[in-house]
Amino acid sequence: MTRHLIFAAVLLVCLFVCWNAVGAQDARSAFSSEETAQDQHVMEERIFINPAGNREKNACLENCRSSPNCKNYEFCSK
């Protein structure tokens, strides 16, 4: 009888671990697609507001350099 209880407990733990792994993967993919959508929106906004002029690009680079969250200047060069 105790073997059956141990087996059931191990099975429940395995199911719980697998369920959490699938949930975490879904959360990561949802966050990644949300982040990509936000990046795309920022890029579209930059292109729309700053249509390829030198002054606008320089202002974009200065804003990006002064922002602690800016990781690269890629969107400024478009």
Swiss-Prot record:
GO cellular component, one term: extracellular region
Post-translational modification, as annotated: Contains 2 disulfide bonds.
Keyword Signal: yes
Positions of the propeptide segment: 25-28
Signal peptide: 1-24
Predominant localisation class: secreted
Protein name (record): U-scoloptoxin(04)-Er1c
Species, as recorded: Ethmostigmus rubripes (Giant centipede)
